[in-house]
Amino acid sequence: MNTRLTIAVLGGGPAGLIAAETLARAGARVTVYDRMPAVGRKFMLAGRGGLNLTHSEPFEQFIERYGPASDWLAPALRAFPPEALRAWALGLGQDTFVGSSGRVFPVAFRATPLLRAWLVRLGELGVTSRVRHEWLGWTSTGELRFTTPEGEFTTRPDATILAFGGASWPRVGSTGTWVNIVSSVGIEVTPLTPANSGFVVDWSEHFRSRFAGVPLKNVRVSCDGQSVRGEAMITNDGIEGGAIYALGASVRAAMARDGSADLRLDLHPDLTQEVLASRLAKRRKGDSLSTALKRVGLSPVAIALAHEVGAAADASHLKSLPLELLRPTSINRAISTAGGIARSEVDDHFGLRKLPGVFVAGEMLDWEAPTGGYLLQACFSTGVAAAKGAQRFVADESSSPTEPSA
């Protein structure tokens, strides 16, 4: 790539930084713009739980985690798969390991060492950063506009990567304000909604005060024909956790159709209904209902939940406990967002069809995935793909013959 060509990367999260690295390695002069005081804030936030980079499951199973977007994201994920992400981390001195659930983490179990080494590498590649630069859109002549502490700033790069993320972590820069900007130039954006988020339940004060923050372990949750086994967490205003996040799309679809969602919980997935009924029938004389439920292996929070919803203490109810979910919790509390720039608006290299030279990566695109390493992996993979798309664009532009002047 011609080193005189300049690329602007807007957004200093994982998608933006890997795009910057990819482009700098190809010889471009890259500047990363971010509204925060430093880049990498969202990457650091992802590291709070150990930095789940990706997942080790077979690729064909892995790709299905992206639901309707699986075929769309597949080329990017195949070009930069989980193995490539792990090799990239190792190249920065951070080896990875596979946890018992198949999730992949750095051995350090923190984001800080990896981000520190990454920023050093980016500096060595000549990538520069301009922080406290909030994007305002484009000027009438096509320049990028930013507001900064020193005033307004404009620039005209040879290509642009947009990688602002969704709207789920405003305190680290993902505010979703880009939606109005790109919509104003005719780009279709599917509304951003909470994904990997909790849902509101109308708990009684007694249940809320006693069990908010208590995990509901080893349950199976179902909604609209979808079923997931895992763990949930009772919250002050509802329920969240890995099993709930995995059903998010089904729950939101039910809410859009019916106004609320009927979640069903199997409180004892290890026992069939028949076996559970048999054990309940052997209830000892003098046992209270709670004691009987405890004897069949239910936890205190599961027993309280059965009481909370007023379900009869029989096997059929304990295997399919009804819980009405009223709405998603605030988007500010979501781990990620669904929605984004519509698939129809970008080409095979994630370039905007209506704005040649502008490419999109990460959560700005209209896809979603459960927790487990799938979110970060797709951000990295689409960041690499968008960068390579920008490489092709500037190469084509620089090689195009120009008309001789008159």
Where do the model's predicted regions map?
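A conserved FAD-binding loop/helix module that cradles the flavin
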Residues: 168-181, 185, 366-395
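A conserved short coil-to-beta-strand element within the FAD-binding core of flavoproteins
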Residues: 131-143
